[in-house]
Amino acid sequence: MEIYLVRHTSVDIPAGYAYGQTDVPLRPSFEDEAEAVKKTLSGHIFDKVWSSPLTRCVRLANYCGYPDTEKEDRIKEISFGEWEMKSWDELSSDPRSEAWFNDWINVPAPSGESLQDQYTRVSHFLNEIRESGLQKVCIFAHGGVLTCARVYAGEYDLKEAFKNVPSYGTVIRLKLD
């Protein structure tokens, strides 16, 4: 089975903010970035296409010619809960952040998720796809989702997740047995 993972294009917010599941705007360069993704996907025929329901993914899927993608909550970005749209500098002064910064794999953000939580929901979704019998699929999602999918495929360990977040507009092909 082949899975094409597509990360949304650049977001139009200041660097250094935890934005997770917040529906943030895309940069004015969206069309140029999206055109590059569209060219990469050109010629591929997918058995099924999914998208995170967040606008930054849906808009890219639409631009690339997939207006009828199935929206899937399990491929949303990690939830930073109460920390959504706060700067990392601001979070470092939150007394609850020490535990998270020391063990972000297992400790959730307040009212949010841990990386393990996100990995669990993404891996359940990928298990369903594997069991479906589909041969070639495409998923428009987020950096954290693409990273979790690559961990699922055995490319690296969850501890290495933040070292391997793909760039905006990246297309990654995974081959699963």
Language model segments and positions:
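Short, hydrophobic/glycine-enriched beta-strand segments
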Residues: 2-8, 139-140
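Active-site-proximal alpha-helix that buttresses catalytic centers in soluble enzyme cores
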Residues: 6-67
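Glycine-rich phosphate-binding loop signature in dinucleotide/nucleotide-binding domains
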Residues: 42-45, 129-135
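Short beta-strand scaffold positions
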Residues: 51-52, 120, 140-141
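Active-site signature of alpha/beta-hydrolase-fold catalytic machinery across serine-
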Residues: 63, 148-152
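Phosphate-handling substructures
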Residues: 64-121
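A glycine-rich beta-strand to alpha-helix segment
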Residues: 135-146
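Domain-level recognition of soluble alpha/beta enzyme cores
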Residues: 156-177
